């Protein structure tokens, strides 16, 4: 059978288009987060109606195999029946207490048991909030102001982090954001990912001034970029030598590439860790944690102030507890890894069969590819990917019932709900789509 042409007429999205058209008069760009607007892939965004397991349905009734998973939280599959059941029971007791609840203890114990660096943890409501709070904490603990981040790494939309950031900033081609004072970013130093020499130079140029180094241990907001052997270990040594703290932003990798996150997978323990996504089971959540002596600086135990109305709310705690219980079941990560490895290998093979330059990889339940020759070791090399062709690919995959992240600079996610049949169908869809756009 000849490949289906990549045309809008092959997929009825009239209701999505009508809803999005109305949304543009109500919300900036018609969305609540920029990447959802399909700016980098073209066309109208798909408006979802419901999700279940590995699938999403739009308001026009089209069904997709979903590889975004709500941007990472849905590692057990959307609307897992055990998570839904636990939430139904919890919601009868109230949606938010604004007071301590025992569920916080339970989830905190699970996080501390799982994540090597975490001796104490504070729950917040988003990854951005976790990273913002962590930044204040490392400055308070060290008495220093400067930080080092890496080009293409995204740590939320707080002012200090919007310097050579990834995620939506990379998608829109913006180096930073209007409204961020130069005085705020003057203390943010940047280095290319996987470049230890640049980090050494920054420490040499800023003696006794750098509070910490923060990074995504696997970059998922500038595509999918893995640390080269020795990079994370080198950062651990450099921070210790210079009296700075090492922070892993595991909002994306936490509980996704292994139960203990990237730090357990790679065997490198930072001083502090930020988390989100998976630990809330699909509800808004964030967390930061680390060594007890550092965390005890957080109010009310210490002087560093941070608070939140909905932090530790019983619904997010309930969903997080049940999700981690499901992930602890024997064989969960073996299944996730095998599923993801088979998927990415099929994608790479399909691209090469079509004569396209392609490179990529996976770790645990996280994967990504670039439409360029590899390897891709940093954000500058990632920018060589063919974004125009990716836009065509994205549309072609929608036509074939597969929902990918609407950006060439975002990682993809699998779940326990993705079956062998889902993977087979997805690989065939890639074959057909690559053939259609090559």
Curated annotation (Swiss-Prot):
SUPFAM superfamilies recorded: PLP-dependent transferases (SSF53383)
Catalysed reactions listed for this entry: (S)-4-amino-5-oxopentanoate = 5-aminolevulinate
Keyword Cytoplasm: yes
HAMAP family for the chain: HemL_aminotrans_3 (MF_00375)
A Pfam family of this chain: Aminotran_3
Assembly information from the UniProt record: Homodimer.
UniProt protein name: Glutamate-1-semialdehyde 2,1-aminomutase
One GO CC term, this protein: cytoplasm
Modified-residue entries (N6-(pyridoxal phosphate)lysine), positions: 277
Gene3D superfamilies named in the record: Aspartate Aminotransferase, domain 1, Type I PLP-dependent aspartate aminotransferase-like (Major domain)
Cofactor list: pyridoxal 5'-phosphate
Pathway: Porphyrin-containing compound metabolism; protoporphyrin-IX biosynthesis; 5-aminolevulinate from L-glutamyl-tRNA(Glu): step 2/2; Porphyrin-containing compound metabolism; chlorophyll biosynthesis
Family stated for the protein in its record: Belongs to the class-III pyridoxal-phosphate-dependent aminotransferase family. HemL subfamily.
Localization terms from the record: Cytoplasm
GO MF entries: glutamate-1-semialdehyde 2,1-aminomutase activity; pyridoxal phosphate binding; transaminase activity
Alphabetically ordered keywords of this record: Chlorophyll biosynthesis, Cytoplasm, Isomerase, Porphyrin biosynthesis, Pyridoxal phosphate
GO BP terms, alphabetized: chlorophyll biosynthetic process; protoporphyrinogen IX biosynthetic process
Organism: Synechococcus sp. (strain CC9311)
Taxonomy, superkingdom: Bacteria
UniProt xrefs under NCBIfam families: hemL, PRK00062.1
PANTHER family with a match to the protein in the record: GLUTAMATE-1-SEMIALDEHYDE 2,1-AMINOMUTASE, GLUTAMATE-1-SEMIALDEHYDE 2,1-AMINOMUTASE 1, CHLOROPLASTIC-RELATED
UniProt EC number: 5.4.3.8
């Amino acid at each position: 059978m000849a490949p289906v042409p990549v045309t809008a007429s092959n997929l009825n999205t009239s209701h999505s288009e009508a809803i999005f058209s109305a949304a543009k008069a109500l919300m900036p760009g018609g969305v609540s987060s920029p990447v959802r607007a399909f700016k980098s892939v073209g066309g109208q965004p798909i408006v979802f109606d419901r999700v279940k397991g590995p699938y999403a349905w739009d308001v026009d009734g089209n069904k997709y195999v979903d590889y975004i998973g709500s941007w990472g939280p849905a590692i057990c599959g959307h609307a897992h029946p055990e998570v839904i059941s636990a939430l139904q029971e919890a919601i009868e007791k109230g949606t938010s207490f604004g007071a301590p609840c025992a569920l916080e203890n339970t989830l905190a114990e699970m996080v501390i048991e799982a994540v090597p660096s975490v001796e104490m943890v504070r729950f917040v409501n988003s990854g951005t909030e976790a990273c913002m709070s962590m930044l204040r904490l490392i400055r308070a603990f060290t008495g220093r102001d400067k930080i080092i981040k890496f080009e293409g790494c995204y740590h939320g939309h707080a002012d200090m982090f919007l310097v050579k950031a990834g995620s939506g900033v990379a998608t829109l081609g913006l180096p930073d954001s209007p409204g961020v004072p130069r005085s705020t970013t003057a203390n943010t130093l940047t280095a290319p990912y996987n470049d230890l020499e640049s980090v050494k130079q920054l420490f040499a140029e800023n003696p006794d001034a750098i509070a910490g180094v923060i990074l995504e241990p696997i970059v998922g907001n500038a595509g999918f970029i893995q640390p080269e052997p020795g990079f994370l270990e080198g950062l651990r040594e450099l921070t210790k030598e210079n009296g700075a703290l090492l922070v892993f932003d595991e909002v994306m990798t936490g509980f996704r590439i292994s139960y203990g996150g990237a730090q357990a997978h790679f065997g490198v323990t930072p001083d502090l860790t930020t988390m989100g996504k998976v630990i809330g089971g699909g509800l808004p959540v964030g967390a930061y944690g680390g060594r007890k002596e550092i965390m005890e600086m957080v109010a009310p135990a210490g002087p560093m102030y941070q608070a939140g109305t909905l932090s530790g709310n019983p619904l997010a705690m309930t969903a997080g507890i049940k999700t981690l219980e499901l992930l602890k079941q024997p064989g969960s990560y073996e299944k996730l890894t095998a599923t993801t490895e088979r998927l990415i290998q099929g994608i790479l093979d399909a691209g090469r069969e079509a004569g396209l330059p392609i490179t990529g990889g996976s770790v645990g339940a996280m994967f990504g590819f670039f439409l360029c020759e590899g390897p891709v070791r940093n954000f500058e090399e990632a920018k060589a990917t063919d974004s125009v062709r990716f836009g065509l690919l994205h549309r072609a995959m929608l036509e074939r019932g597969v929902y990918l992240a609407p950006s060439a600079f975002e990682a993809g996610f699998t779940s326990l709900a993705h079956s062998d049949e889902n993977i087979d169908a997805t690989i065939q869809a890639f074959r057909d789509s690559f053939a259609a756009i090559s």
